């Protein structure tokens, strides 16, 4: 049977798929829109499965406050171009709304939005991944987003401006812990053992080596903790000193950055071109 423009439009409106894909599905199902939708869903799932192996290390970090807490969400795609796409961002924001409403786990978020994700993968042509969601509790919360790629929420007892500035510091300086004493004992001991070995290899006497290690360990725990770091807005003071001056405290923070921990494929374009030239000469 002949497929009409009205049928194609209806299928496009309901699925968001391209015109040619809609026409193809309608032709294969003799104009039955419901069967065409089922066919496209099956086809989309197959396409999404193929795309699943593609590295998705671009994307966005989103933040939204709930009642006494905030949600931070990372959704990934393959390219920074798609990371700015309106359909991709609408999907990410829809996931965030559900997460922020009731602290939904990442597993439940993935399951709830899997069908929508598959449809988006089919439409956009890239692997899309709802990667992680983090929640932070607190009566006083301040958030900061650096572009689309970094999101920070800080919880503490301080005025809004102070917490906001601390959130900006966290975005820039990447602390791992709030205070030096929060650094896990096993991490401290591993670093201490390494520093002792380094000092001994330098030929230092044991007593001097011990003093050197003490100083290095203080520096180590300070550099990876928020309150021990030099404050980006007043580098001669630590964040801890600034907070003390203001009678403020920070109890927790969460920092997410797009793609952190994802191994990206390194592209060697020179080698690729050389290989293509060699192939043409073969």
From Swiss-Prot:
It is found in: Cytoplasm. One of its GO terms (molecular function) is translation elongation factor activity. Keywords: Cytoplasm, Elongation factor, Protein biosynthesis. Residues 79-82 are annotated as: Involved in Mg(2+) ion dislocation from EF-Tu. Pfam families: EF_TS. SUPFAM superfamilies: Elongation factor Ts (EF-Ts), dimerisation domain, UBA-like. The keyword Protein biosynthesis applies. One of its GO terms (cellular component) is cytoplasm. Its main location: cytoplasm. PANTHER family: ELONGATION FACTOR TS, ELONGATION FACTOR TS, MITOCHONDRIAL. Associates with the EF-Tu.GDP complex and induces the exchange of GDP to GTP. It remains bound to the aminoacyl-tRNA.EF-Tu.GTP complex up to the GTP hydrolysis stage on the ribosome. Belongs to the EF-Ts family. This is Elongation factor Ts. It comes from Shewanella sediminis (strain HAW-EB3). The lineage of its organism: Bacteria, Pseudomonadati, Pseudomonadota, Gammaproteobacteria, Alteromonadales. The gene is tsf.
